[in-house]
Amino acid sequence: GDAVDDAFSDLLDNAGSMNDVLSDRSDIAIADLRAINDQLRVIIDLIRDAIDEERDKDLDDYFEDISDQDGDGKPDAGLISTCQNDGSVEGDVNVGGIAGSMAVEYDFDPEDDLTKVGDKSLDFRYLARAVMLDCVNRGEITGKKNYTGGVVGLMDLGRVSGCQGYGPVSSSDGDYVGGVAGASYGFIRDSWARCQLSGKDYVGGVAGYGSTIENSRSFIEIDKGEAYVGAIAGDMEEDGTLTGNLVGHDTLGGLDGISYTGKAQPTTFDELSALGNAPGEFTQ
């Protein structure tokens, strides 16, 4: 009997020891699971933050305008040069003698012309290049609504250099009318405008509204303009660049009716014509 009691006692003691071991291991496993759960929460929070950040982005955040760069070894990429228009152009919105708009088409790669650079990533950007060089408009440009320009109606991005606008530009019921561009959020340089302009608000000799306008010349007549009217630009972006432009107008100032030395400076038509780079057509 005593031997049986001793055997049961040993069995119970061993069972108790085993239970203690299992309990310790269970505590360790639970602690490990809790640590894993905490890390999962951290990862989920990071993913949620990344998703929220992407949701807060506009489409423009995915595009970088590289039109003012050298073309990354591809000088003809995104380039229009030495085009001329002598015909009348009519349209509703985004009307121009050479191009209606310089902008990004948001439909996903309709022509299979995207080039991928780098490894796969959720944080991606598109590089956009749109350059217009030495183009001339002589035709009459007529729009019904916003963004009517002698050379291009709307520049969401891009660069226009050495272009000339001679044909009359008008919008019957719209804003943003310009001898070169109706509105430009890109770069306009070394361009010339000698034409008649008519619109509602934001009417300018070079651009109705501009971001960067440099070393450009205008000798224009404005038949109609209500607010923000200038011989170079009707108005500019707050942090825009306006420099080296010349205005051949007796009474109208360069920017919203006011001239600025070194930026939108008044001069005479004879002085404009005497400039070494003045196009022959401009001086006639």
Predicted features and spans:
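Predominantly extracellular beta-rich ligand-binding scaffolds that present long acidic/polar faces
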Residues: 1-284
